[in-house]
Structures are given as structure tokens and as C-alpha cells.
Amino acid sequence: MNLIKQLEQEQFDKLSAGKDIPEFGPGDTVIVNVKVVEGDRTRVQAYEGVCIGRSGGGLNESFTVRKISYGEGVERVFPVMSPMIDSIKVVRRGKVRRAKLYYLRNLRGKSARIVEKQDRQAAVGE
């Protein structure tokens, strides 16, 4: 293992020690709780939307979340290992066949919806 990979692994372990980052991907609806600093106070703000892509890897990995706010599309890019992220929660899993869902930017209304992925284990267990 070379020196750069070793340093990155140490930083990755240190940053992810207190966090529980769930497995999620494009098409999943997530709630990202972000720490917002206002003056001398900090508060947690929830940002809910569809993950339209992940990029990078290791410490540099980030993901883009898109939501519709008052009829206007808003996208925000979050670094996965950011100390400003309090928690990430997956609300529902989406069934998509693309790694990047940039085509959602051009869709409106019902056509912009993503079909929910059916869990095969739950269907077998019933």
C-alpha cells in the first residue's frame, strides 16, 4: 500500500468513526440532515430529495440530491465525508437503470417520478 492510500485510509477511518452512512445510490430518496451555522448557533436542517448521482471515491466521494421547492428544481452537492452532514437516511429505494439521472432535469410532474424498487427478500418471506 503506497503512502497516499495509507494516509487516505487513515483519514477515512477517522472521519467515518462516528457516522453511520447507509448504502444508497441514484434513484433513492434520501433525507440529509445538514448542520447550518447561523452566527454563534448551529442547527440541523433536513434536505429531502432524490439522489441523481454519486461521483468520486474514498474521501472525495460526493452525491447530488435534487428536490422541487415551490415549483423550482433545486440541486445540492454533498461530500459524503463532510463534517457538516449530521446524518443520512434512505426514505425509499428507486428502480433506475442509469448511474446519473440528469434527464430528470427536463421532466415535470408525474413523468419525473421514479418507480419504487420492490425488495425480493420481503416478497419471498410473505
From Swiss-Prot:
Name of the protein in its database record: Large ribosomal subunit protein bL19
Source species: Bradyrhizobium diazoefficiens (strain JCM 10833 / BCRC 13528 / IAM 13628 / NBRC 14792 / USDA 110)
One GO MF term attached to the UniProt entry: structural constituent of ribosome
Any GO CC annotation of this UniProt entry: cytosolic large ribosomal subunit
Recorded family membership: Belongs to the bacterial ribosomal protein bL19 family.
Alphabetic keyword roster: Ribonucleoprotein, Ribosomal protein
Gene: rplS
Record bears the keyword Ribosomal protein: yes
Keyword Ribonucleoprotein among UniProt keywords: yes
